[in-house]
């Protein structure tokens, strides 16, 4: 599927734009599942000012989506009408530490932020070492693992609104809840500051090694997967509910529930986005029938079928 090319008209209305605009760009290679259709427009801003300029001049009726490293995302097979914004690591991927503060761009890998903190003897951010995403996604979904969450360490976040206005959000402003934040979904996060605590370097490294070991032994990290598929319902582990419903190893087309960790869906090689989403919905239905508990997607799904 392809969409009408609107990049010439966008460029005409944005003469000072410095970032890159691409029409009908495939998104499959930008997601960990390696599935999905094209973006009508893929925009990579040069920096925060360029992002703000673009949004301020973009017609309000054009939908906008953000894609990071695509680790917790399904792009549907029909692609995405409108604009997909990808914050490139070169412009938004820096991470640095000073005292007990870590500053990171929204495109910085969570794992990289943990490493920068550890190099400065800053503890408290080790949990990021086991999360395969970026800081932008961590801010949006209050990412957490291994006993830590973004809400525990965030000082403030910067972002740009749909109208191009820049914003700064305190921890309280973020209105964090389990695997979500209360900030307007149209805000595109650009950077954040975190506070840890100065600790013994060996203790920090040991904790990070534990986190990595857990990932390697308990999760299918070498597969084409989107990470944790469903949120844990209060008082329950999603994977246990999926397992109890007899879904371990269940397949739809080229998509399969992981044998190693059944809260992970994997692309066995030739899956479509439809296969993966259908499998997820099948699992949800079986869990509901077996336990009466409704699972909610943790993976974001965007685009048209």
UniProtKB/Swiss-Prot annotation:
What are the disulphide bonds in this sequence? none
Q: Which organism is it from?
A: Bradyrhizobium diazoefficiens (strain JCM 10833 / BCRC 13528 / IAM 13628 / NBRC 14792 / USDA 110)
Kind of enzyme, top EC level? oxidoreductase
As cofactor, the record names: FAD
Q: Where is the FAD-binding PCMH-type domain?
A: 34-199
Q: Which Pfam families match?
A: FAD_binding_4 (PF01565), MurB_C (PF02873)
- Residues the record marks as active site: 179, 228 (proton donor), 298
Q: Which Gene3D superfamilies match?
A: 3.30.465.10, UDP-N-acetylenolpyruvoylglucosamine reductase, C-terminal domain (3.90.78.10), Uridine Diphospho-n-acetylenolpyruvylglucosamine Reductase, domain 2 (3.30.43.10)
The UniProt gene name for this protein comes to: murB
Supply the name of the protein.
UDP-N-acetylenolpyruvoylglucosamine reductase
